[in-house]
Amino acid sequence: MKTRISELVSVLNQYAKEYYQLDQPSVSDAEYDTLYRELVELETAHPELILPDSPTHRVGGKMLDGFEKYSHVYPLFSLQDAFSREELEAFDQRVRKEFPQATYICELKIDGLSISLTYEAGNLVVGATRGDGSVGENITENLKRVADVPLTLPEAVDITVRGECYMPKASFDRVNKQRQEAGEAEFVNPRNAAAGTLRQLDTGVVAQRGLATFLYQEASPSEATSQSQVLEKLDALGFVTNHEYCLAESIDDTWDFIEKIAERRDDLPYEIDGVVIKVNDLAIQEELGFTVKAPRWAVAYKFPAEEKEAEILSVDWTVGRTGVVTPTANLSPVQLAGTTVSRATLHNVDYIAEKDIRIGDTVIVYKAGDIIPAVLKVVDKYRKEQEIMPIPSHCPSCQSDLQHYEDEVALRCINPICPSQLMSKLEHFASRDAMNIAGLGSSIVEKLFGAGLVHDVADIYKLTVDDLLTLEGFKEKSANKLYQAIQTSKSNSAECLLFGLGIRHVGSKASKILVEKFGDLETLAFADQEAIASLEGLGQVIAKSLTTFFASEGAQQLLAELKEAKVNLTYLGQVVDENAALSGMTVVLTGKLERMKRNEAKAKLEALGANVAGSVSKKTNLVVAGTDAGSKLTKAQELGIEIKDEAWLESL
């Protein structure tokens, strides 16, 4: 019985690979179904014999309660965008300034959802979304229902891989036809369909929708020496990789590839929105490193956005949390990149003047970065007697005089008590990436502000249940729920609070770097500008913005009020002692460890102050080598780098 189940699992997985990955089925659907039904019957009779890679794991459904947060062991960085050949050439110049010999690999930018897959001893244990790059959602059960995601690997390896989950065009058409027949709203594009499917609580729906994947990165430490070798390894392990890539010696080569792909884009069976160009050599990648947000060794070229004509009907002016006044055009509705667009940004007053945009003009509209509708230019042939657009002289929120500084393109309201600015700051403070106060959205902020209950972020922590009950729409249950969410946020780590304060130029990544280094906001508030600027990935702009903010009397008062409200001001992540054994050292793990899992070894090294890198370079201080260590060990020996074994690591 056990042997027959094993045979069926093996042959059905092979048939599935032929069908889904190779598009070369060797048996009919009827033959597959017969074998599949036999396996189901045997597993039903003998559930103790069900194998982890059985294809029956992929079908059928169960209802999930929700998705838990998942902290990525290896962070997922976003990529710097490029929209022209000139921007690609600038990227190339930055790379070749340090590494004249660098070559590139060009891969298609799949328009889907970024995923991370983690395997232990060859078995899939976690499948997660990208989230903010540090924390995503655990969607393992749903990813198990994606036909080409391997449940087990041919080797008992510990590995974390990255890729894109997408909905092929054929699946998208089929799903939308079914939804149309059922009287349900159709998905606007394959990316939205894939995202919505992966967040389904009914796993059976995921199994039916025909999602697919392309894997492209080994996130855990790799024995490969190049990105092209990584793709070969992923292929060998049974992952689906995209073979539409090219190796390029120069930016001329990459541009040739981009132009050829652009011509074939509509004929591909899946949606793409660009081409990713990476330095192929992993050691050079390691040397180039990262900025706060993105790797310095890669860039994502985005194809020109779809453009449509629309008429500007009117213009709204709104004030953001930094006081910038932004114009937004109300348009005659147009279909653009799968959605109906009736509003588009006009950026700023300088842009309006430069393009001579007027109400009543017919303009070209596109989606900047395929996301934000924007006005590109005026269609001059339709210009009649439209008057020059009136530019506001007073803030649309508080009626204060607006400023237009010489070194800025935007109008700015500098009134520190401008209602729109204050409300926007409160919304930002409560947002998911900041203090994550569930239920405190824009409409509730507006009610709180209008009732005079809050004016700054410290006031949020002075709210009582009775205060909330005075607001329209609040009952005992909803008031208690929001109150508890506010109290819970007090225990967040300090990087959430720092980001929530909305200091100019200080994003979530920079916030974490800062509080990790200085330990708490009170220490950071008195930090020297040069000490801040010297931190990797930051610089003078962020440092000056921080020191200017904390030097103000208002900021000191705000910190005091937050502390009095018992809001945590301290970094709660792991703090490494500057005198730790490996403090400041770059360490590479290679080979197979006998007694420790690779993740455990990485965590221990980091706890000892090390920066664990994925490849050996001149910056590497130490290599920890297990058995069967390959090219990394050889390179370390050639460079004269100190080499230690697993026993040494255990002894620390």
UniProtKB/Swiss-Prot annotation:
Reactions listed under catalytic activity: NAD(+) + (deoxyribonucleotide)n-3'-hydroxyl + 5'-phospho-(deoxyribonucleotide)m = (deoxyribonucleotide)n+m + AMP + beta-nicotinamide D-nucleotide
Residues at which NAD(+) binds: D29, A30, E31, Y32, D33, S78, L79, E107, R130, E164, K278, K302
SUPFAM superfamilies: BRCT domain, DNA ligase/mRNA capping enzyme, catalytic domain, Nucleic acid-binding proteins, RuvA domain 2-like
DNA damage is among the record's keywords: yes
SMART domains assigned: BRCT, HhH1, LIGANc
EC number: 6.5.1.2
GO biological process: DNA repair; DNA replication
Chain sites annotated for binding Zn(2+): C395, C398, C413, C418
Swiss-Prot/TrEMBL cofactor(s): Mg(2+); Mn(2+)
KW Nuclease (keyword) present: no
GO molecular-function term, one example from the UniProt record: metal ion binding
Record Pfam families: BRCT, DNA_ligase_aden, DNA_ligase_OB, DNA_ligase_ZBD, HHH_2, HHH_5, Nlig-Ia
Active-site residues, Swiss-Prot/TrEMBL: K109 (n6-amp-lysine intermediate)
BRCT domain mapped to chain residues: 577-652
Keywords: DNA damage, DNA repair, DNA replication, Ligase, Magnesium, Manganese, Metal-binding, NAD, Zinc
GO cellular component: cytosol
Family recorded in the similarity comment: Belongs to the NAD-dependent DNA ligase family. LigA subfamily.
Function: DNA ligase that catalyzes the formation of phosphodiester linkages between 5'-phosphoryl and 3'-hydroxyl groups in double-stranded DNA using NAD as a coenzyme and as the energy source for the reaction. It is essential for DNA replication and repair of damaged DNA.
UniProt-listed NCBIfam families: dnlj, PRK07956.1
Protein name, entry field: DNA ligase
The organism of origin for this protein: Streptococcus suis (strain 98HAH33)
Lineage: Bacteria, Bacillati, Bacillota, Bacilli, Lactobacillales
